[in-house]
UniProtKB/Swiss-Prot annotation:
Protein name: Phosphatidylethanolamine N-methyltransferase
Species per Swiss-Prot/TrEMBL record: Clavispora lusitaniae (strain ATCC 42720) (Yeast)
Gene3D superfamilies, per the entry: 1.20.120.1630, 2.60.40.2840
Stretches of the chain found on the membrane's Cytoplasmic side: 56-63, 167-177, 255-256, 348-356, 425-436, 533-857
Family note: Belongs to the class VI-like SAM-binding methyltransferase superfamily. CHO2 family.
Reaction(s) this enzyme catalyzes, per UniProt: a 1,2-diacyl-sn-glycero-3-phosphoethanolamine + S-adenosyl-L-methionine = a 1,2-diacyl-sn-glycero-3-phospho-N-methylethanolamine + S-adenosyl-L-homocysteine + H(+)
Gene name as annotated: CHO2
EC number: 2.1.1.17
Length: 857
């Protein structure tokens, strides 16, 4: 990087600013010239050691250093925070410099001379104060304030660490087994080294400009966006998040709760500083333009349209007292988490038995939740079961997501409530019936447990903020991409997803782990293990395979920020190439989806076995051959059948003409019936099953024609035969050759422009065979159906024919629901449009990548 960098003030003045040194080099490198302020800072830092020599009581030292640390930490977060806030909102520091003319050569005041001397001493004799804007010079002075406060903050913290470590004759080295002391020192050292690497990497990435909050004073040209490189790809705000793990490493080494509390105190104030000072300024300087912000708000509002335009219940957040499901959720939570354990602890004599009951309840509820949610998602992903049912019953597909959200949230609440209730019972009974696996370090366990619980809450909040309620409730499984804004057409890489592809896989069980750490019993460990296994299965074998199907493997398999940094810094280039996703567009097998592929194959094979007939079509035809009546005086011949490779066939709904021939003076009560071959093949000379009104008299004529149509026909595919019966009885005189009734396939297009052609086919091949009076596509179908004897049965019959002929599943009362909505004005044209819409939704739910692979196969 060039030493000369371009900057621009907020007034629009451009300038070139020279290279500056980092804090450590400036203060502690003896080869670097020290200004007066820098010498004062170094002196003050060294003076901290005087406490060790002037105060003999170590506890007093600890108290003094803790007080000093609190002072400097408050100076950091509230002192520097106040200055930066004023500069960000009002340019107060620059305006004070301008008002006092601190950098004006002609100003000979004491403060002006001190400030100018300091700047000149920092930058060297070649630096021209007047050639640089006031904002840059003010920043140089501000840096010295930062140097003093930050270094004093760190040095006083280290003094607290040392004072606590050497307390009671170097207590950090004894009082524990050797292995535990060694482990503590090693882990603490690793955290410190990692913290050091984070700080160094962050400084190398953002340089002094951002390290000293330079963007509060001026902008660096060609640096308009936030930098996401190095450690900034691994952690959000690494200086304030991972940049403080070293504090906890020092607490481990010092073996001191005092150091731990001080570290937590400092870290907490730093997060307050981030929230109140840094983030507002970052949003103002680097935030998205107003139209993009508005678009994000629109996406969130679009999300609400899938949930009745009201924010859905997530846990117990967004609780709405006017929503029945919320009330039930609250009652369930209070019942399982509070009421049952409290009453049980007071009224139960056998505490151990009750504890086992609560454990079994927690296990059963978690197992039930795992089975139901995973099952629903698998069925929806592979067979679109839920969406198909909603569309088939004329319900908006959006309702499927809303109802699943209620189911999902209710079951999740039940699992957490039963788990919490079990542990509340343990605490109320003071663990009388169960021993802890780990008994020591109670305060450390509570601290780490609460930290894990808070981590899960924060991660879940970030997930909802990044992917919205739509993503939180697996909206990709239920809603096609075309139904949402273009921003939903790709996986989110913002928020926590910038750093981790599946944050819930790592942090989704943190809360349960936290409770287990606080109350480490075997029951909790078993439930925690079950939770982890379910979480792993759901993400890797349910969610991931579906995401690949919808968005493509390349997009799903993109490296997260953490993985990029790990590869870059820890893996050789030769190994990195093995992890790269192929850039070609050819579909490839997914190594992590072998289980799902095997599962799909098993289900498809099972379904084919269950739906295939027990006896083949050819065998049924052979069984029906009329070998028993070769010399009979009676005969049946079927007219108008279409030839096929094995047996002639007709189509469902089309009238069938049967010619009969009988001897003279036969009974006028002879009759002909239509039967399934599979139902009658075991009895040749007598029919033992009912014809269900699919019959007609022959009359006294010796020959004639009987037409079977509408209600006298079967509406199922299969092999059939006609039987000639004698004298109104069930004695068989002749059986016709077998024939097949097939389903006429009607292709439903995906384009609305082809609705008229689809309507014509529906009317010709379905409605004209079932009802009368529907002469065109604009005539309400109720006109024809209302003339039938059983209106409801006709509605259901037509719906069944539509499902079988088009392949688009509709409920048996689909037409009834549509007629009710339109006031009996629903037409064949409307039906065609509705079928196209259903087909389009189901098609889009398959996912672009899945359909592309299917075509190639």
């Amino acid at each position: 990087m060039s030493d000369q960098r371009k900057g621009i003030t907020f007034d629009g003045e451009t300038f070139t600013f020279p290279e500056t040194n980092d804090m450590v080099k400036t203060l502690f490198d003896p080869t670097v010239h020290k200004s007066a302020c820098e010498l004062i800072i170094v002196t003050l830092l060294v003076m901290n050691s005087l406490v060790f020599y002037s105060v003999s009581n170590n506890q007093s030292r600890i108290n003094i250093f803790v007080g000093m640390y609190i002072f400097w930490r408050l100076c950091y977060n509230f002192g520097i925070g106040f200055l930066l806030n004023q500069q960000s909102n009002r340019f107060r520091l620059v305006k004070i410099s301008e008002k006092m003319r601190l950098f004006d050569k002609g100003n000979k005041s004491f403060w002006a001379r001190c400030v100018q001397t300091e700047v000149q001493s920092q930058m060297g004799p070649s630096y021209s104060i007047s050639a640089h804007p006031v904002a840059f010079n003010t920043w140089l002075i501000f840096r010295k304030v930062v140097d003093l406060i930050l270094m004093e903050d760190f040095i006083t913290f280290m003094c607290v660490v040392v004072a606590c470590a050497i307390d009671s004759d170097y207590q950090f080295l004894h009082g524990q087994p050797v292995w535990l002391t060694t482990l503590r020192l090693v882990i603490g050292s690793i955290l410190i080294v990692f913290n050091f690497w984070v700080k160094v990497n962050a400084h190398n990435t953002i340089k002094d400009y951002a390290w000293y909050w330079g963007d509060f004073f001026f902008r660096q040209i060609n640096n308009d966006d936030l930098i996401f490189d190095g450690v900034f790809e691994m952690f959000p705000h690494p200086m304030y998040s991972a940049g403080y793990v070293g504090y906890y490493g020092f607490a481990l080494i010092a073996k001191s709760y005092t150091v731990l509390i001080v570290a937590v105190f400092g870290h907490f104030l730093q997060m307050v500083f981030l929230h109140l000072v840094e983030n507002p300024h970052i949003d103002k300087i680097y935030g998205p333009p107003p139209n993009e912000t508005s678009l994000k708000k629109l996406v969130k509002l679009k999300d609400l349209s899938f949930f009745d335009n009201v924010a859905p219940l997530v846990g117990l957040v967004n609780f709405n007292i006017l929503r029945a499901s919320d009330i039930i959720n609250l009652l369930n939570c209070l019942t399982y988490a509070v009421a049952i354990p409290t009453v049980s602890s007071l009224a139960t004599y056998n505490i151990e038995a009750m504890g086992k009951v609560l454990f079994c309840i927690a296990i059963l509820i978690k197992g039930f939740e795992s089975f139901v949610i995973n099952g629903v998602l698998l069925l929806q992903s592979n067979y679109k079961t839920i969406s198909e049912w909603y569309l088939a019953n004329n319900l908006p597909v959006e309702n499927s997501l809303n109802n699943f959200a209620v189911l999902y949230n209710s079951l999740i609440n039940l699992t957490y409530s039963s788990f919490v209730g079990m542990n509340v019972f343990k605490l109320l009974t003071k663990l009388k019936y169960q021993d802890l696996i780990i008994t020591g370090h109670i305060y450390l366990r509570i601290f780490l447990g609460l930290l894990l619980i808070i981590t899960q809450v924060m991660i879940n909040t970030s997930i909802v903020d990044s992917i919205g309620y739509f993503g939180w409730f697996y909206g990709d499984f239920f809603i096609p991409k075309a139904s949402v804004l273009p921003q939903r057409a790709h996986l989110s890489k913002g928020g926590v997803y910038r750093y981790l592809n599946n944050p819930e896989q790592i942090f989704g069980v943190c809360g349960v782990m936290g409770v287990t750490m606080i109350v480490p019993t075997y029951d909790n460990f078993m439930i925690c293990l079950l939770w982890m296994l379910n979480n792993f299965f759901r993400i890797n074998f349910v969610e991931r395979s579906h995401m690949i199907k919808i968005y493509g493997e390349r997009e799903v398999s993109q490296d997260s920020g953490v993985m990029k940094t790990v590869k870059k810094h820890l893996l050789p280039e030769s190994i990195q190439k093995k992890f790269e996703v192929s850039p070609t567009n050819e579909p490839k097998k997914r190594t992590n989806s072998v289980f799902i592929e095997s599962f799909d194959s098993f289900i498809k094979e099972l379904r084919s076995k269950n739906t295939s007939p027990v006896v083949s079509k050819e065998r049924l035809a052979e069984m029906s051959q009329n070998e028993f009546f070769s010399g009979s005086d009676y005969c049946l011949e079927i007219e108008g059948l279409e030839d096929s490779s094995f047996v002639p066939h007709s189509f469902i709904g089309e009238p069938i003409e049967v010619k009969f021939r009988a001897p003279a003076k036969h009974s006028p009560k002879d009759w002909v019936g239509l039967y399934k071959v599979a139902h009658t093949s075991f009895s040749r000379y007598r029919t033992l099953v009912s014809s269900n009104n699919r019959w007609d008299w022959t009359g006294p004529e010796e020959q004639g024609t009987i037409v079977f149509s509408k209600e006298k026909l079967f509406c199922e595919e299969g092999l059939y035969e006609f039987r000639y019966h004698l004298d109104g009885k069930h004695d068989v005189a002749f059986i016709s050759a077998p024939f097949e009734i097939k389903l006429r396939h009607i292709e439903v297009p995906l384009e609305s422009a082809e609705a008229d052609e689809l309507a014509n086919q529906l009317r010709k091949y379905i409605f004209d065979h079932v009802v009368s009076g529907v002469d065109d596509n604009e005539t309400p179908i109720f006109v024809g159906i209302s003339q039938t004897q059983d209106i409801v049965a006709t509605y259901e019959h037509i719906a069944m024919l539509i499902t079988k002929s088009t392949g688009v599943k509709v409920g048996k009362r689909f037409l009834i629901y549509n007629d009710n909505e339109t006031g009996n004005k629903f037409t064949v044209g409307d039906l065609a449009s509705r079928l196209i819409n259903i087909k389009k939704v189901m098609h889009e739910l398959e996912g672009d990548e899945y359909l592309r692979i299917k075509k190639l196969e």
